[in-house]
A protein has these predicted regions:
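Phosphate/adenylate-binding glycine loop and adjacent helical scaffold
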Residues: 1-231
Length: 231
């Protein structure tokens, strides 16, 4: 899978170029346009088979908020093209999977190729109890290939070398699996209410963290001020 973005667009689409037989999985609803030699089909977003697979996909969707389905894209010949739009305006980056593997927060997945795949990792209740981002699951990558991750706003890469950093959880996009992490409230419940900082991620070790410049929860709260109130 080769991918391109148009630098002239403020919020660019991502165009994928596919060879014959090449398969890509994309976020459901992200397709904007494609060439006639590209076909799309819906797959259950879970491993296994039969009814058990369906129940697993639906159950995971109910708990994590992730869709029960994922879209499979196959090019029937060379020079197949498909354009994708993330569900939030912002930067899209590639994560190359193989020697490096990552975890992703909710809403960061856009596309995946090769033999790469992801699973949803169940967090402890203590980690996720107050989490508005990440839910009870985080995406955990495996295999070889390229994963496209999208953000709300711009993405900054932070590299740790046997160090520690605490980041607002709503700004976290992805991080290396080599890092230890702990999702918790900043300075306890009442201090978090007072400072407005809320849920944070503390990372320790050596690896990469990708953070987004904007906070979707904060923007939603801003919009809510201007929405008509129900009587």
């Amino acid at each position: 899978m080769q991918f391109f973005t148009d630098s002239n667009m403020q919020f660019p689409l991502v165009e994928l170029s596919l060879n014959q037989g090449e398969t890509v999985f994309i976020q459901r609803g992200s397709m904007v346009y494609h060439t006639p030699n590209v076909t799309l089909s819906t797959k259950l977003n879970a491993s296994g088979s039969g009814l058990g697979r369906f129940v697993k996909a639906v159950g995971r969707s109910m708990v994590s908020g992730e869709s029960s389905f994922i879209t499979q894209v196959i090019s029937q010949s060379n020079n197949g093209y498909i354009a994708l739009a993330p569900d939030s305006p912002g930067q899209v980056i590639p994560l190359y999977l193989g020697e490096k593997q990552y975890r992703l927060n909710d809403g960061a997945f856009l596309a995946l190729d090769g033999t790469a795949y992801y699973t949803m990792e169940l967090e402890s209740v203590g980690k996720a109890l107050f989490g508005g981002q990440g839910g009870f699951f985080v995406m955990t990558t495996q295999g070889q290939g390229t994963l496209l991750a999208n953000a709300y706003g711009s993405i900054k890469k932070i590299e740790l070398n046997n160090q520690e950093v605490t980041i607002d959880n709503a700004h976290v996009v992805a991080w290396s699996q080599t890092l230890d992490y702990n999702i918790h409230l900043e300075n306890g419940f009442w201090q978090s209410i007072g400072t407005g900082e809320g849920v944070v991620n503390t990372f320790r070790g050596t690896g990469e963290i990708y953070v987004q410049s904007l906070n979707l929860q904060t923007f939603a709260g801003l919009l809510n001020r201007y929405l008509p109130k129900r009587s």
